Amino acid sequence: MSVVVYAPASIGNVSVGFDVLGAAVSPIDGTLLGDRVKVEAGAEAFTLKTAGRFVDKLPANPQENIVYDCWQVFARELEKKSVVLKPLTMTLEKNMPIGSGLGSSACSIVAALDALNQFHASPLDETELLALMGEMEGKISGSIHYDNVAPCYLGGVQLMLEELGIISQSVPSFDDWYWVMAYPGIKVSTAEARAILPAQYRRQDIVAHGRYLAGFIHACHTQQPELAAKMIKDVIAEPYREKLLPGFAKARSYAAAAGALATGISGSGPTLFSVCKEQAVAERVARWLEQNYVQNEEGFVHICRLDKQGSKVTGSEL
């Protein structure tokens, strides 16, 4: 008995919703932009194997890997429910660059916990599992936040609510939009990207932020794509973080001139996203980004759609 779960890349913040909005994306060409985790019966309580394009970026000691932490908290929750934890072997296929702004840690966390839950016949419900995912994300970044794990697990665009026992809810989206994702191949640490933000904001920035976020959510619910795209603006993080991203301002200008609806920083960067209505525009923007924003062979550009499914079982073998 074995199960493999794939968890897709995600855009934290989506520019307009700092720490409260996230979107899952998948390339239109079928490329797996995300991590996979396999869980199978094992001889010992826990064994971890690693594979994938970015395997060399993982800690050498399995007990320093976030997947080990996921197994520990999952075991803790099973004990509370008096469910027996099976001896198992986990394999993390690390396809996502670390520190990329694509929700790399969320991919590993979501794939690991979803696979563990599936392997044990789903003893934890969706909300319980999502709460664990947020806890694990907090272990890495220093504070519990759901703007990557929620869309990665549940799919689509997710708005973080964290009230009445509701962690997040999905926001109606525009399924004909293309999301061009460009990772330059350099690393930006989330901690550094947070440290650069001011401790206090001017009143006019707070008012603008509220208007853009409320306007975006309203436009999504009333299905006004042009208005929604106009509202994808960031006054909280982007003005400060763009100095950490070589070439971002130039890329944003090019994308706008080429016909993109909006361009922003994915999470804390360095990946950027560009929203386009027509595939021809998306392809033009993608070509330019490949030639001008990508800095080394680790970088890449993908034309994506929203991933409405989130994490999913892809079979029993990697």
UniProtKB/Swiss-Prot annotation:
One GO CC term, this protein: cytoplasm
Catalytic activity: L-homoserine + ATP = O-phospho-L-homoserine + ADP + H(+)
UniProt xrefs under SUPFAM superfamilies: GHMP Kinase, C-terminal domain (SSF55060), Ribosomal protein S5 domain 2-like (SSF54211)
Pathway given in the UniProt record: Amino-acid biosynthesis; L-threonine biosynthesis; L-threonine from L-aspartate: step 4/5
Keyword hit for Magnesium: no
GO molecular function terms noted in the UniProt entry: ATP binding; homoserine kinase activity
Keywords annotated in UniProt: Amino-acid biosynthesis, ATP-binding, Cytoplasm, Kinase, Nucleotide-binding, Threonine biosynthesis, Transferase
Subcellular location: Cytoplasm
GO biological process annotation, one example: threonine biosynthetic process
Enzyme class: transferase
EC number: 2.7.1.39
Key word Cell inner membrane present: no
Binding site for ATP: P97, I98, G99, S100, G101, L102, G103, S104, S105, A106, C107
PROSITE patterns: GHMP_KINASES_ATP (PS00627)
Function: Catalyzes the ATP-dependent phosphorylation of L-homoserine to L-homoserine phosphate.
Family, as annotated: Belongs to the GHMP kinase family. Homoserine kinase subfamily.
PANTHER family: HOMOSERINE KINASE, HOMOSERINE/4-DIPHOSPHOCYTIDYL-2-C-METHYL-D-ERYTHRITOL KINASE
Protein's name according to its UniProt entry: Homoserine kinase
Organism expressing this protein natively: Vibrio cholerae serotype O1 (strain ATCC 39541 / Classical Ogawa 395 / O395)
Gene: thrB
